[in-house]
Amino acid sequence: MEQSLDGKTALVTGGSKGIGKAIAKGFTDAGAKVMITSRKAEVCESAADEIGGGCEWEAGNVGNPEHMEQAIDRTIEVFGGIDILVNNAATNPYAGPMIDADLPRWKKTIDVNMTAPFLWTQMVWQKYQKHNGGVILNIASVGGLETNPMLGVYDVTKAGLIHMTKQLAAELAPQVRVNAICPGLIKTDFARMLWEGDGGDMVAQQYPLKRLGEVEDIAAAALYLAADSGSWITGQAIVLDGGGQIKF
């Protein structure tokens, strides 16, 4: 089945490192023109150079509607459209029991992990995909499908993102396919506190496949869903966790 993205254009939020950068690299390798966006200009520029393939960048606060509109407009201006939107940017400023969370960090987590993906999707739909079709990919988490004593606030936002995926898939069909990817523990800087040292080995041993995920694992799934290979998939939350959901 075809997994080429020749002639396609993509916008990846949080695309300067980790999962977002790997997805952007996978898309450019498959022939797409990609715009990445993240907060720091120097990090975006360096990432775009490493990604190659004519990757462009637009720095700014991914939760700021003004930046969203600027990045979307520039992507359409430079590439002619946005066939694929990847809502990857996320934050996790609080770890601990959800009942003890303070309001500022609660609101920040919701703003970045739920409100921002909705606004990015809404703007891309209104400015391009409503009339041209496309694909939306939301990077959620297995945390959105289960409970965790220390990550409740983060997990609630990812559960919301998963349901948002299903709702928007129903609303935007047949023009746009909307799917979520739910990674388990991936070896990124974002999740370093969970996998560095003995903790990562302990988690890996709980997975039937006995290893932690790599960013390339997520990029491969994103490519499958974005390309024609995923043309009959929408409204799904695809779990990539080394079998963690089925462990004994």
Predicted regions, residues:
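Short C-terminal tail/terminal secondary-structure segment
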Residues: N92-A95, E146, L223, T234-F248
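Alpha-helical segment proximal to the catalytic Tyr-Lys
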Residues: Q126, A169-P174, S231
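C-terminal helical subdomain
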Residues: A180-P183, D201-S229, I233, L240-G242
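Substrate-binding pocket helix/loop in short-chain dehydrogenase/reductase
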Residues: G96-M98, D102-I110, A191, V203
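Residue(s) in the substrate-gating loop at a strand-loop-helix junction
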Residues: S141
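Conserved glycine-rich cofactor-binding loop
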Residues: S16-K17
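Active-site helix of classical SDR
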Residues: T121, T157, T165
